[in-house]
C-alpha cells in the first residue's frame, strides 16, 4: 500500500499556483485511476484506489503547508503505511521549470512542508517527486503563491503529467527505476 501526498494550499485563490503543484499532480493521478478525493479525514481530503495490484491512498492535506506532517502522519498511522511507501509531491525552487527530480530520501531543502513531514515521520527516508518552479526574481512568498505565465503554463502542464507518471513508476517499478527514467529529462516549449 502507498500513500501519495500532494502538497498545496486549500482555497480557490491558490488553485494553479506554483505552491499547489502537489495538489495538481494528485488530481491527475486521481483522474487517470478514477479515484474520487472526496473524503475528509487526516486533516485533509483523500481517496482510495489502485494502481495495478497496489492499493493507494491519495491525500491532499488541508493544513497550512508548513503543518503538512500532521496530515501525513495521521494517514500513515491509520493505514499502517511504511515510510518508504509514502510518496510526497511538491514544488522546488532549486529546480528549473521543465524539470522534476525523484528522490528516495533527503533533506527538506528549505521547503517548510517537507521539513514538517520529516519532523513528524522522524525520518527523511521517504520517496518524493520534486517539481521545478525555478528561482524567483521577486519576493519568495509572492513567487510561490503566484501563477505561471502563459509560456510557463504550457511547460508546467507537461511536467505535471510527467510527475504523475513518475509517481506511478515509483509504485509499479520502485524509486530507483523512476529516478533513472525521469531525472534529467527537461521539457521545453
Curated annotation (Swiss-Prot):
Record InterPro entries: Pept_tRNA_hydro, Pept_tRNA_hydro_CS, Pept_tRNA_hydro_sf
List of catalytic residues: 19 (proton acceptor)
Alphabetized CDD domains for the sequence: PTH
UniProt GO molecular function: peptidyl-tRNA hydrolase activity; tRNA binding
Keywords annotated in UniProt: Cytoplasm, Hydrolase, RNA-binding, tRNA-binding
EC number(s) on file: 3.1.1.29
Catalytic activity: an N-acyl-L-alpha-aminoacyl-tRNA + H2O = an N-acyl-L-amino acid + a tRNA + H(+)
Chief place where the protein resides: cytoplasm
Superkingdom of origin organism: Bacteria
Chain positions of site Discriminates between blocked and unblocked aminoacyl-tRNA: 9
One GO biological process term: protein quality control for misfolded or incompletely synthesized proteins
GO CC list: cytoplasm
Family listed: Belongs to the PTH family.
Function: Hydrolyzes ribosome-free peptidyl-tRNAs (with 1 or more amino acids incorporated), which drop off the ribosome during protein synthesis, or as a result of ribosome stalling. Catalyzes the release of premature peptidyl moieties from peptidyl-tRNA molecules trapped in stalled 50S ribosomal subunits, and thus maintains levels of free tRNAs and 50S ribosomes.
NCBIfam families per record: pth
Subunit architecture: Monomer.
Full protein name: Peptidyl-tRNA hydrolase
Organism: Clostridium botulinum (strain Okra / Type B1)
Amino acid at each position: 500500500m502507498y500513500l501519495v501526498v500532494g502538497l498545496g494550499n486549500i482555497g480557490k485563490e491558490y488553485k494553479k499556483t506554483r505552491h499547489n503543484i502537489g495538489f495538481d499532480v494528485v488530481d491527475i493521478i486521481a483522474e487517470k485511476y478514477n479515484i474520487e478525493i472526496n473524503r475528509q479525514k487526516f486533516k485533509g481530503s483523500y481517496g482510495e484506489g489502485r494502481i495495478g495490484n497496489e492499493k493507494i491512498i491519495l491525500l491532499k492535506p488541508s493544513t497550512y503547508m508548513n503543518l503538512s506532517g500532521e496530515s501525513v502522519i495521521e494517514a500513515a498511522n491509520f493505514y499502517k503505511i511504511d515510510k518508504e511507501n509514502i510518496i510526497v509531491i511538491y514544488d522546488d525552487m532549486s529546480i528549473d521549470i521543465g524539470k522534476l527530480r525523484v528522490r528516495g530520501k533527503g533533506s527538506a531543502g528549505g521547503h517548510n512542508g517537507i521539513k514538517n513531514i520529516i519532523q513528524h515521520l522522524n525520518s527523511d527516508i521517504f520517496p518524493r517527486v520534486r517539481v521545478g518552479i525555478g528561482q524567483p526574481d521577486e519576493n519568495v512568498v509572492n513567487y510561490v503563491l503566484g501563477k505561471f505565465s502563459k509560456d510557463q503554463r504550457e511547460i508546467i502542464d507537461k511536467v505535471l503529467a510527467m510527475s504523475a507518471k513518475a509517481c506511478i513508476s515509483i509504485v509499479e517499478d520502485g524509486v530507483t527505476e523512476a529516478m533513472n527514467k525521469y531525472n534529467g529529462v527537461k521539457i521545453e516549449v
